Amino acid sequence: METRSRKRAEATSAAPSSSSSSPPPPPSASGPTTRSKRARLSSSSSSSLAPTPPSSSTTTRSRSSRSAAAAAPMDTSTDSSGFRRGGRGNRGNNNDNSDKGKEKEHDVRIRERERERDRAREQLNMDAAAAAARSADEDDDNDSEDGNGGFMHPNMSSASSALQGLLRKLGAGLDDLLPSSGIGSASSSHLNGRMKKILSGLRAEGEEGKQVEALTQLCEMLSIGTEDSLSTFSVDSFVPVLVGLLNHESNPDIMLLAARALTHLCDVLPSSCAAVVHYGAVSCLVARLLTIEYMDLAEQSLQALKKISQEHPTACLRAGALMAVLSYLDFFSTGVQRVALSTAANMCKKLPSDASDYVMEAVPLLTNLLQYHDSKVLEYASICLTRIAEAFAPYPEKLDELCNHGLVTQAASLISTSNSGGGQASLSVSTYTGLIRLLSTCASGSPLGFRTLLLLGISSILKDILLGSGVSANASVSPALSRPADQIYEIVNLANELLPPLPEGVISLPTSTNALVKGSCQKKSSPSTSGKQEDILKISPREKLLGDQPELLQQFGLDLLPVLVQIYGSSVNGTIRHKCLSVIGKLMYFSSSEMIQSLIGDTNISSFLAGVLAWKDPQVLVPALQVAEILMEKLPETFSKVFVREGVVHAVDQLVLVGKPSHASPTDKDNDCVPGSARSRRYRRRSSNANSDGNQSEEPKNPASLTIGANHNSLDTPTASFMLRETVSSCAKAFKDKYFPSDGGDVDVGVTDDLLHLKNLCTKLTAGIDDHKVKGKGKSKASGPFLGDFSASKEEYLIGVISEILGEISKGDGVSTFEFIGSGVVAALLNYFSCGYFSKEKISELNLPKLRQEGLRRFKAFLEVALPFDGNEGKVPPMTVLIQKLQNALSSLERFPVVLSHPSRSLSGSARLSSGLSALAHPLKLRLCRASGEKTLRDYSSNIVLIDPLASLAAVEEFLWPRVQRSESALKPAAPIGNTEPGTLPSGAGVSSPSSSTPASTTRRHSSRSRSAINIGDTSKKDPVHEKGTSSSKGKGKGVMKPAQADKGPQTRSNAQKRAVLDKDTQMKPASGDSSSEDEELEISPVDIDDALVIEEDDISDDEDDDNEDVLDDSLPMCTPDKVHDVKLADSVDDDGLATSGRQMNPASGGTSGAAAARASDSIDTGIGNSYGSRGALSFAAAAMAGLGAASGRGIRGSRDLHGRTLNRSSDEPSKLIFTAAGKQLSRHLTIYQAVQRQLMLDEDDDDRFGGSDLVSSDGSRFNDIYTIMYQRPDSQVNRLSVGGASSTTPSKSTKSATTNSSVESQSHRASLLDSILQGELPCDLEKSNSTYNVLALLRVLEGLNQLCPRLRAQTLSDRFAEGKITSLDDLSTTAAKVPLDEFVNSKLTPKLARQIQDALALCSGSLPSWCYQLTRACPFLFPFQTRRQYFYSTAFGLSRALNRLQQQQGADGSGSTNEREMRIGRLQRQKVRVSRNRILDSAAKVMEMYSSQKAVLEVEYFGEVGTGLGPTLEFYTLLSHDLQKASLGMWRSSSGDKVSMQIGRDEIEDGKPSAANRDIVLAPLGLFPRPWPSTADISEGGQFHKVIEYFRLLGRVMAKALQDGRLLDVPLSTAFYKLILGQELDLHDIVLFDAELGKTLQELRVVVARKHYLEGVGGDNSSTISDLCLRGCRIEDLSLEFTLPGYPEYILRSGDEIVDITNLEEYISLVVDATVKRGVTRQIEAFRSGFNQVFDITSLQIFTPSELDYLLCGRRELWEVETLAEHIKFDHGYNAKSPAIINLLEIMGELTADQQRAFCQFVTGAPRLPPGGLAVLNPKLTIVRKHSSTSSAAANGAGASETADDDLPSVMTCANYLKLPPYSTKEIMYKKLLYAINEGQGSFDLS
C-alpha cells in the first residue's frame, strides 16, 4: 500500500503535463450544459444524491488542489515540487494518524493554494496573450500538437493549467473560461461517460446481470486506475450504492464484487475511506465476516477492512470488527490469517478511552495466538496486546483483567531463552522488544502482573537473556549477535518496573532535569527514617509482597545485580546506564542489611560506585552519592573500610573540589561522551540535537550529554552548569563530612596499609632497576657486555621483589583497582621489562643487542614466577591475576570517546543504519569557488553543484577542469540562453532578479532541462549533479559555509534532483533583505544550466528503479550484471594467464602492477599514523579506510565515465587542480562527504569533536546546506604535502609504498615486539600522556610474553640442559601453560568499538575516533575475534562493502532496511565470468589478472552448465584451492612418501573422479608451507621457478579476493605460512609448525650447540668433552650430515664437500633455518604479498592471529551437535521442526563424520566448510524444503507418498542453500539416498 502510493505520487509529480488538470466533475453529470453548476457543487462539497460526510469537502478540495498542482510546471518553482512532496507526506500521515493528520493536511493545502494563486497570478501576467490564443485554437485533436509546439508547448499548457487553477480557486465556474488541454479533457470526458454508465448499471435494481456487469467493470477500472486518473471519481455517488449491493444477500457474486470494489477504492483513493465509513460499509463487512457463509466473500471483506482500518481504526473497532476478524481465524489459510491479525493490529493502534468494551473479549483469543506456529501471526498478536496494554496502562484494574487471561505467563515464556534457543528463533527483533515492553507495562501498572512475574522467576529469565547478549559475562560474544541497544534498554526497564517506586527525595534518579537539582542531600532525610514515614503513611501492594516474601527480592538481587553492574560498565548508551543505576538504587534501598551483605559477596558494589563517581557524568553523580549514603546507613562498618580501599572516598574528595572554579575543567574532560561546561558557541547552538550515547525513544527528552536533561533553555547556560556543580559539590561535601570527616587537613584519609606496602615494593623495584642500569653502563664502558656475578645476583633480587608484588596482588582479598592504579605497579613493571629505559631516553643502536639479551633473560625469569612450570591446577597463575587487575584499571581509566553522527544517536539497530543510509542518499550542495589570487582559472562560484556525498574530489576535478580552464576550446559549450557564462559573471552580478533574463527564455530552458543529471566521477553509473547560479556571494573566505537551517522536511534524492535548480544558497551571513525563506523561494528566478553538464534522461524516477546502477562501487564498464565474460583460454598447454601476468610484473621484486600501484597510491600510507595530524579523528580514516578512494570506489583507481574513458589519472600524473577548505589542502582521494565533515570537525575544538557533537543535524537539513570548496592551480608554492593533514602522498612515495611499506613496515610489526618493549613504546601514535598508555603498554608486553611463552620455556630448558641440570633431551618437549586469550579481552572497550563501527555516517566520513585505529593496531587482543572481524570488514574493503556488511548484519537480526534507495547505497556491483571446469587453474589466472584489482564481486559460472550465483562461485574457489595444492606445481613442501592424510582440513572424499584427480595433492599433515628454492634458481620467464612465483602471486590475489567477497577457500595453510603473511619473522622454533620431525631435530642440535658454548665459557680444558658431545648417543660426525638442505639435495647450503661436525654444527643449523624459513622462501612470500596487495592492503590483516586468519579464510571445522542444528536451519514448504523427515535428517547430520560433513557442505553450499560462526551465520540460511515425487503415476497406482519418495534423490539449490528433501519412509533409506546424492552429485551444476 505504502509503496504503491509512493510510486503514484512520484508518477504524479514527474508528469510533464497534467491529465487531470480539468476540474473534477461530480458523478451525477448528465450533460455538458450543467458543467459550471457541477463544478460549483463540487467545490462546495454538495451532491444531489446523498448528504456528504464532513471530511468529504476536504477530500474533494484536495483533489482539485492536486490537479492544479500537477498541472503546474514542474521546473519553474520550488513550490510545485515541494507541494507534491508535501502531499505524499500527508498521505503517509493519514495512514498513521487520521484525524490529526487531516487537520495538518488541510492547513498545508490552504497554504499551498495561496502560494499557487500567487504563482498563477504571475504567470497570468507573463503569458496571458499566448494562453488566450492557445485556448482559442485548442480542440480535441490536441495530440498532434506534441510535435509542433517546440519549447512553447509545455509552457503554454502549464500556463493554461495554472490559469485554470487560479480561476477555479476564484470559484463560480470561472475555470471554464479556459478549456483543459485536449488530452486531459478528452480522456476525462470519456472516463466520465464510462462512470455514468457503470453507475446506472449499479442502480439497475432487479437486473442482477446488469449489476454484475457494472460491478465487474468498476472493479477493473479501479484495479488499474491511479489516484490522478480517478480524480473525477465521485465517491459520494458510488459508495452508497456499493454498500447497498454489499447487503444483497440473495446474490453472493454481487456481494463479493461489491466488497472487491470497495477494497480497490480504498486502495487507490485512500481519502475515500472516510466516505466508506460514513455510509456504513464497515458494519456490512463485519456482518459478512461473522456469518462466514461464503469463504471468498469473508476473505474479501477482510481485505477491505484492512484497508479501512489503516485510515479509520476507531470506526472499525466500534463496529465490532476486532472480534469479527478474530472469531473464525482457524477457517482461513495462513496468508489470510496474517491479514486478519494485521487488521486487528491496525485497530489497536489508537484505542479510545472506552476501548475496553470492544477489546477485552478479544484478549483471550490474542493471548492464545502467542503460541501460534506462524511467526507473522504471532508478531501481529503481540503487537495487538502491546498496544492494548499501553492504552490501559493508567488503569490498574483493566491491566489486572488483561493479566487474568494468562497474558503475562505466555509473554514471559516467549522471551525466555530456554524456550526457543536464544529467544528470537521465531520472533523478529521488534516483536521480541515489544513483548518485553508489554511485560514492563503489566509490571508497572498491574499488581497482579507484578506478582505473577516475580513468582515466575522473571529475574532469572532476564539474567539469561542479558548474559547471552554479549554485553556482560562473556565479552567474546560477537557484537553482531548481541541485542540492539533499545532491546537492552527495555530489558533493564522491565527490571526497573519489577521493583516498587522509591519514596520521593530518597534517590534523585536521572529521569528529568528537576529531579537532579531538587534531590539534593541537604533536603533529604536518612533512608531509614524516610522509609518508616512511608510505611506509616501507605504501603503499596508491591512493597507488601516483597516484605512478606523477602526471598523474592534477594533472588532478584542475586540474579541481576552482577549483570546490571557489567552492563553499566560496558554500555555506551547513557539511557541504559541511567536505568541500570535506577535498578541498583532501588535494590539497595529495599534490601535489608543482611541481603546487601550477601549481594556484595558476588558483586563489588563499592568499585562500581567509585567508577560511577569518577566518570563525572552529572546525571548520575548525585544518585550515586545517595546510593553510597544508603549503603553507609545500612552497613557502616563494612563500607567505611571498603569505600576507602575502592576509591569511593577519593572520588568524593575530587567532587568536593569540583565546586571550585579552578577544578571545573577536569570534570568536563574526563567524560566518555560529551564534554559539558567548556562549550564553544557552536556546540551550544546545536546542543538541542546533541545526544552522544544513542538515547532511546523512551526518554528522548533526556540527552546523555553533560548538558543535562531536556530543558535546554535553562540547563544549556553557564548558570545551570554552575548550579549543577554546586549541587554535586554540596552533596559530596555533606557525604564526606558525615561519614569520613578529615582530621586537621589529613590528606591521606584514602590510603590503606595494603597500598602503602605495594608502593614500597614498587619503589624498591624501581630503585633496583635504576641502580642496575647505572652500574651496567659503567661496566659496559670498560668491558662491553657484562655477565658478572653482581648482575646475576641483582637479577635475582629484582625477580624476588616482583614475586612479592605478584603475591601481594594475588592474596586472598586482593588489591582493589583503586589501590592497584595508585601503587605504581604498572610503571615499575614496565621499567623492569624495558631495562630501565621506559619513557626515558632513546636506546642507541649500539646498546640494543646487549639490551635484547638482558630483556630476554628478564622475560624468562618473569615467566618462571608468573607462569610457573609446576603450576597447581586449581590455583590461578599470578600472571592471570595481574592481567585481570590491568583490565580493571583500563576500564576504570579509559575515556575513549564514542563519536556518533547524529542520526545514530537517537536510534538503534536497523533504524540507526537506515537513518545513516538515507542521509547518504541525499546529494550535497557544493559551491566551487576560485581561490583568491588565482588568475589563470575562471570562477565557477555562481553555480551550485548537487553531488553524490560519496563522490571523490578527483571526480570533482574531472568535472570542473573543462569548465574553468582558460583554453578557447573549453570555453565553448552550447551557448547559454538569456544569461552570461557563469565563469564570466562580474563579482557582484546576481541572477536571482527576474530581470536578469527574459522570463520566457528562462522558463523554456528549464522546461527542457529540468530532469537532467550529470555523470561525475563514477564508472558506468550516474551521479545526480545539478548546477545553477544564485544571487548569493561567491563564498570566498571560510571554507565551509554554516547556513541557517532551511527546509527541514524529509527529502529523498529524487526530490532533491527535481528541486535542484530551485534551491536557494543560504548562508550564515545575513542576506541583503529581511524576507522570509518562503518569500525568497518565491522570488527565485530560474537560472541557466550549463549545456555541457546535461545528459538527457527520459524520467528521473527511472534512476530509482535501475537495478544496474550502484551508487558506491567503482565498477568498470565490463562489470555489468547483465553480461557474463566468457574466459576462454588458448589451446596450447602454455599457461596463458600466467604468461600475461609475468610480462606485466617483475616476479622477483615483489613489485606491484599498475593497478596495484594505483591502489597503493589510493590507500594512504598506513604506516603514517599521524597522517592527519595530531588531532587524530581523521587519521584513522586515512589509514584504515585507505583514503576512501578505494573505499568509495571513486578513487584514482580505474574510474571511467559513461563512455569508458579513464577519468582518474595514473599516480604519476600531476593534478590539474588542488582543493582547499578553511586554508587546508584536501586530498583528491577524499570523498565530498569526508571533506565536508573534516571541515566541520576542524571548526570545533577537541572537546566538542570528541564530545560527540553533531556530524549531521537531527533533521537531515545539513544536506540542504551549501558547502564551499576553493580550487586553484597547483604551482610551486602550493603543491606540497597536505598542510591540513589530508595526507596527499606524492606519486613516487605512493608507488614505493606498494612494495616497501606493505612488506618492510609489516615485517617489523611483530618482529619488533622486543624492541618496542625495550623502547617502552606502543606501535601507534597514542599520546603518552593518556592515562591508559602505561596500562596498554604493560598489557601488550604480557600478551607478547604469553604468545612467546612456549619458545621462552624451551629456551629455559635449553639453558638448563647446557648447564647440565637436565641430561635427557626428552625433557625439552614439556608443554607450557598459557593464559587464555579471553583474559586479554576488555569488556568495556569491546562494545564501544562495536557501537562505533555500526555508525554508517561515521564510516563514510572517516570520522571514527583515532583510538579505534590505534588500539586495533597496537593491542588487537583487547577485542574478541568477532569484533575485530567486523572492524576489518568495515574498514579494509571500502565503503560500499562496509555498508553492505552493516545491512546484512541488520538483516540477520530480522530488522534490515527495505528502503530501496538505502539498499542501493550498500549494493555491490557484480562481475560474472564463465570458465572451463577442466582448466580451473589457467582460467583463474586469467580471471584474477583481469578482475582481482576491481571492486566488483566476482561470480563464476561454467561452460555448458546452467548453475549460476553463489554455489558455482564457492565451488570455483574450492576447485581452485585443490588445484593450487598439486605437487606438480612445485609450490609446497611435501612430507616424505607417507600416505598420511592431512589433519588440517583436507581429507578427500573417495567418490570416483575427484579422488583420482587428487592423487597429485601435496601431503602436508601440518599444513602447507612454501618449498624452499635456492637463490640461484632460474627466474627467467618460462622457467619452473618463474611459474612458482606466478602461482604464489595468483594465490595472493585469490586469497585477498576471497576475503573481500566473503568466499571460503579449502587451502590448509600452515600456521607458519600465516605468520609470514602477517609480516612476522620465523626462526628455528617455527619449523616444527610445518615439519615436526625436522624442527625437533634442529632444536635438539641447537641444544647440543648451547652445551658446547657453556663448556667453552666455564674455563678449563673441555676440548675432549666438547668433541664427544652426542645427539641421542650418536656423535655429530656419525650423522653423515652434508651442507645441503634436508629433503632437497639440490639446494646447496655451502660450497664444498665438508661434513657437518661439532665445530661447524652451529653454522649448519643457521644455514638450514635460513634456507627453510627465510631466504629460501622470501621471493615466494613477496610474490604472494604483491598479489594480495593488488586487491587490498595486506597490513590490515595484522589485527588477527594466524589461527584466526585461517578461520577467517577457510571457515569452521567443528563437528555439528544435534541439539544446535535445529536452531540454525530453516524448515519450509511442507516441513517444520516436528516433521518426521526433519527429525531423521537432523539425527543423520549429527552422526556424520568429519569427512561426510565436508561432503554435505560441499553438496549443499558449494564449499566444503562453513563460514566463521558455522551454520548460525550461513547466509542465506540453510533451508530444508519438501521435494514432491517426480513420478506422477505412483499416486494413480495407489502407492503412498513415502513409498514414492523412496525412489527419489535429494537435490539442492546452492545459490540459496536449499536442500530439497523427499519425505523418505525410514531413516536408513534417507541416509543411503543422501550419501549417494552427495557422492555422485559433485562436479556439476544442473537443474534439480
Swiss-Prot record:
Biased composition (Low complexity): 41-81, 986-1002, 1148-1157, 1286-1303
Protein name: E3 ubiquitin-protein ligase UPL3
Tissue specificity statement from the Swiss-Prot or TrEMBL entry: Widely expressed.
Biased composition (Acidic residues): 137-146, 1076-1113
Composition bias type Basic and acidic residues, residue spans: 1-10, 97-124, 1019-1029
Annotated Pfam families: HECT
This protein's pathway: Protein modification; protein ubiquitination
Matching PROSITE patterns: HECT
Active site: C1855
Gene Ontology molecular function: any one: ubiquitin protein ligase activity
Chain segments carrying region Disordered: 1-157, 660-711, 970-1119, 1134-1157, 1280-1307
Domain (HECT): residue spans on this chain: 1490-1888
ARM repeats: 227-267, 270-310, 312-349, 351-390
Keywords in alphabetical order: Repeat, Transferase, Ubl conjugation pathway
GO (cellular component) term, any one: plasma membrane
Gene Ontology biological-process annotations: DNA endoreduplication; proteasome-mediated ubiquitin-dependent protein catabolic process; protein polyubiquitination; trichome branching
Enzyme Commission designation: 2.3.2.26
Catalytic activities: S-ubiquitinyl-[E2 ubiquitin-conjugating enzyme]-L-cysteine + [acceptor protein]-L-lysine = [E2 ubiquitin-conjugating enzyme]-L-cysteine + N(6)-ubiquitinyl-[acceptor protein]-L-lysine
Region annotated K-box, chain positions: 1377-1451
Family stated for the protein in its record: Belongs to the UPL family. K-HECT subfamily.
UniProt function note: Probable E3 ubiquitin-protein ligase which mediates ubiquitination and subsequent proteasomal degradation of target proteins. Involved in the repression of endoreduplication process and the cell morphogenesis in the trichomes.
